[in-house]
Amino acid sequence: MGDSILGYHAHLGAGVILSNVKLDHSEIAVSTPDGDIPTGLRKFGAIVGDRTEIGCNAVINPGSVIGRDCMIYPGVNFRGVLPHGSMVKLLQDLQVLSRRNIGLA
């Protein structure tokens, strides 16, 4: 959670990552619907608003801005700007298959 700003009563569940460096080490920009806003920084985590809850093992990518009173569910990988009072859930399809050739080693 380096180089990040956490609001009053913001909560990060176990294993949450607020990433602060891009993989290619280039300048971090905040991505908005109106375009990117350059920060001039190579290390910049996230801004997390007051009373926001981020669930276990979520990953918040560099330059993300999370509004106040938001909820990000466990396992979400988020990048961008999340408006105040928003909620993000991960939708995934699980496929359960039967195992064949189950034997003792």
Language-model region placement:
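Glycine-rich hexapeptide-repeat left-handed beta-helix
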Residues: 1-105
